């Protein structure tokens, strides 16, 4: 009986750490990949300078596209572990919204990354034609529309749904809950003000993951603070 309790306690501590590590990994990889993509494919890229710019930034795009799938895998792990560790505290409605919006966010990020990759590959085959007929401009516009309009709003929905669960379960301090709501609303309604605002999401995941890691490392104090995964046992 004692050994079972010890094993259960270890599992409760190990799983939050896994979520924290996955969240930190996602935040770092996604942050870097988005910066590389935006610098390599800026919104105002057009005209005769586009060819030279694309040629000199092919490596940056390739590196970003390599990191995006791994960032997605880390985010899937983060979602799965957090949802599993909600346990009996899980609200089926908000958990379903959280998981669905997270999957849609990843799908749209992958689609935007695939379009960026298609631009680079096609440019290597027929550079002049792509510049002349506007394919590069069109593809870049689709990529930024998917990323800045749809993916970012799904990220906002993810934040709101998870934050609502935290509010109900008191899993995190109240100030953090209110800050999360404010940032989520900002992503939902004000994304057109700055195309760099998508970086709010990985920064938020990073802060959350650091908090989870900090609490989990405190051992028995984790349950005393109402940490995610505490089922009141």
Cite the ranges covered by each PLM segment:
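Hydrophobic, aromatic-enriched alpha-helical segments typical of multi-pass transmembrane helices
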Residues: 2-233
């Amino acid at each position: 009986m004692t050994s079972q309790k010890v094993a259960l306690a270890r599992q409760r501590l190990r799983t939050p750490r896994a979520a924290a590590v996955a969240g930190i990994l996602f935040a770092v990889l996604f942050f870097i990949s988005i910066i590389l993509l935006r610098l390599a494919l800026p919104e105002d890229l057009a005209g005769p300078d586009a060819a030279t710019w694309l040629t000199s930034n092919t490596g940056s795009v390739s590196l970003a596209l390599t990191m995006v799938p791994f960032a997605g895998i880390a985010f899937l792990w983060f979602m799965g572990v957090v949802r599993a560790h909600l346990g009996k505290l899980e609200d089926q409605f908000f958990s379903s919204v959280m998981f669905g919006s997270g999957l849609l966010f990843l799908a749209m990020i992958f689609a935007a990354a695939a379009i960026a990759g298609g631009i680079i590959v096609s440019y290597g085959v027929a550079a002049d034609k792509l510049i002349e007929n506007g394919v590069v401009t069109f593809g870049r516009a689709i990529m930024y529309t998917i990323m800045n309009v749809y993916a970012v709003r799904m990220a906002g929905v993810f934040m709101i749904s998870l934050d609502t669960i935290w509010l109900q379960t008191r899993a995190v301090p109240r100030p953090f809950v209110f800050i999360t709501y404010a940032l989520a609303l900002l992503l939902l309604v004000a994304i057109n003000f700055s195309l760099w605002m998508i970086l709010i999401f990985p920064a938020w995941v990073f802060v959350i993951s650091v908090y989870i890691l900090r609490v989990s490392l405190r051992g028995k104090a984790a349950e005393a603070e109402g940490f995610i995964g505490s089922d009141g046992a």
